[in-house]
Every structure is written in structure tokens, then in C-alpha cells.
């Protein structure tokens, strides 16, 4: 929401947690944050709202927020990951290794960009290099580096504090607050879960990026 206040965000959930979905610019992933509700809501929430209005509705002092009016959302808002059926996938390296992989990828991109002849320093050529680098998978997993890059850019891979305040984002339902970083899979979806939030994306090779799976009314 801080990156693009004009964007739309999807809210969904009910007692005891509320999930907020967004699609950050430049990353073909969905960002997911969840918060525990202090009191149950009268009915489940499932609507698309303005990211800027949602941000302005949050009162940090009282830890309260109002629900903005619904807006017509982008196509991705009707293509959300499944709520259940997630299983942990082995092989994910630790946060330090993931951070080093992202740093190495960024350094490679800069070096290759600087090595381009002047006449080839075009947007299309830089995009081609970026796609080649960020589509590589992390270690022995199916997770593309761009998902790890997105998680790091969003602050999801920062060190876990010794004590997490009550107002900190809660994990998805069924996951403890101290849950370590993990790679999960459900159907054609992958999710990189951290104590601060998750990034989700369709598995590599699925047509259309986020694709057209589980279309729901918006």
C-alpha cells in the first residue's frame, strides 16, 4: 500500500483473522498480510478496496481500522490462492542464503547492464536480462528468485524480533506466530511464508503468470 496508494487491495476473512492481498508493482506475485481481529465480525469480509483509502483508515494508536467502500478491482483480485490445502515443500534455504542469492542476482544484473553496448541499453534488453535472472529458481526448489526478491523488498525477510507485539501481522490461520520461513504449495500455487507476511504466485510454467484460477466475484 505504501508503494502504490492508487492500487487496489483485496480483503478477505473472518474470525479470528483478516487477510489483505495486494500486487506490488514490478513483481508478478501476490503479497499477503494477515492480522488478528480483536473481536469477531458480523459476517465474513471479502471485497476489493482502494489501497490508499485502506491505509488512511488505519488508526495505529487504537489498533483499529474502518472498512473502505468497495471498488472495481483489477483482474488479479479475482484470482486468489486457495485458503487451505497447503503443504510444506522441503529444500528451502535459510533467510541468509536467500538474501545472498538476491544480492548476487542484483549484482549480476547491474554488471550485465553496464556491459551492454550503448546502442543495446534499451528497456526491452534490460527486461530480457531481468526475466532471465529473476526466473531462475532458488536452490532445489521451484521458487523463482523474483519471489524471494519481492519478499525481501517488502520487508518480509527481515530478522524476527525476540518479542512480536500484539499489533504485528499475524500468520495465516493455522500457522503459529513464531512459524519459521517456509515454502508451501497447494495445487498450482507456491507461497513463501514468513512471520511478517507471505508472497504467493503460480508455479513456473503455468500459463499467464497469476493466471485464471479460482475466479471469484469481485
Can you describe what each PLM-predicted range is?
Residues 1-37:
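N-terminal ordered "arm"
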Residues 18-20, 30-32, 42, 182-192:
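Generic hydrophobic secondary-structure signal
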Residues 19, 36-39, 50, 214-218:
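Aromatic-enriched hydrophobic runs in primary sequence
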Residues 24-29, 38, 198-200, 207-209:
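Short, surface-exposed beta-strand-loop junctions and turns on beta-sheet-rich folds
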Residues 31-66:
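A broadly used, surface-exposed interaction patch
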Residues 65-218:
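Long, compositionally biased intrinsically disordered terminal regions
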Amino acid at each position: 500500500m505504501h508503494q502504490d496508494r492508487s492500487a487496489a487491495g483485496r480483503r478477505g476473512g473472518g474470525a479470528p483473522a483478516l487477510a489483505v492481498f495486494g500486487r506490488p508493482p514490478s513483481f508478478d506475485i501476490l503479497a499477503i498480510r494477515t492480522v488478528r481481529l480483536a473481536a469477531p465480525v458480523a459476517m465474513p469480509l471479502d471485497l476489493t478496496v482502494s489501497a490508499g483509502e485502506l491505509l488512511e483508515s488505519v488508526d495505529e494508536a487504537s489498533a483499529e481500522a474502518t472498512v473502505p467502500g468497495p471498488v472495481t478491482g483489477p483482474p488479479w483480485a479475482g484470482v486468489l490462492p486457495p485458503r487451505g490445502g497447503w503443504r510444506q515443500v522441503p529444500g528451502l534455504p535459510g533467510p541468509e542464503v536467500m538474501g545472498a542469492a538476491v544480492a548476487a542476482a542484483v549484482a549480476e544484473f547491474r554488471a550485465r547492464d553496464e556491459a551492454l553496448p550503448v546502442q543495446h541499453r534499451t528497456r526491452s534488453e534490460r527486461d530480457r536480462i531481468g526475466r532471465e535472472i529473476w526466473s531462475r529458481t532458488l536452490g532445489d526448489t521451484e521458487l523463482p528468485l523474483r519471489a524471494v526478491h519481492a519478499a525481501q523488498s517488502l520487508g518480509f525477510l527481515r530478522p524476527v524480533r525476540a518479542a512480536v507485539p500484539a499489533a504485528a501481522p499475524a500468520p495465516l490461520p493455522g500457522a503459529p506466530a513464531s512459524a519459521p520461513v517456509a515454502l508451501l504449495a497447494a495445487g498450482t500455487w507456491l507461497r513463501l511464508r514468513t512471520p511478517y507476511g507471505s508472497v504467493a504466485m503460480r508455479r513456473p510454467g503455468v500459463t499467464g503468470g497469476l493466471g485464471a484460477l479460482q475466479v471469484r466475484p469481485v
